[in-house]
Amino acid sequence: MKAAVIDIGSNSVRLMLWADGKVLFKTLKTTRLGEGTAFSPFLKAEAVERTANAVAEFALQAKTEGAEQVFAYATEAVRSARNGAVFLTCVKERSGIDVEVLSGETEAKLGLYGALGKSSDGGIIDVGGASTEVCFREKGELVFSVSIPLGAVRLFDLCRDDRALLQESITPYLNALNEAPKKLPVYGVGG
């Protein structure tokens, strides 16, 4: 069976088509859905339009390529936006697809499984556009997971080249990392 997943991030939308455990096709469009969310709790109308159009295009492409199922997931930009429901409605109207908004913890777990597979112990730091997820697994069990609402795009929009402001922005979240395991390998994920 062929299936597709559409990953709606704060900076880009990704499409991956697979069958029988093998990736057949991957592509990405930069839509900057989370543009401006460092200063406003609302998604910009232009960003909603760009991103909904990309999702509709990818849904059509997946179906044209023979995908029997198309799954779509959204992350921090939609999760934290006061008008996230407007975006979800727009996507549904244009593509016919219901988008699932992932919790920060689920996003972190999926990043961990994607980087480490089902059995390896270790952790990931997944820097997205609007959030950063940190997740660890030890002896097959999830032992730590946190989602921090600061990602590369959001921090750049907020701080630009101001290192003092950058430090001030991230310091409140550093204590959340104190409980993370210290002796496991850690892998960086992003993009």
What is each of the regions a protein language model found here?
Residues 60-89, 185-191:
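Short beta-strand-loop/turn "lid" adjacent to the catalytic site in phosphate-handling enzymes
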Residues 100-124:
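Conserved phosphate-binding catalytic cores of ATP/NTP-utilizing and phosphoryl-transfer enzymes
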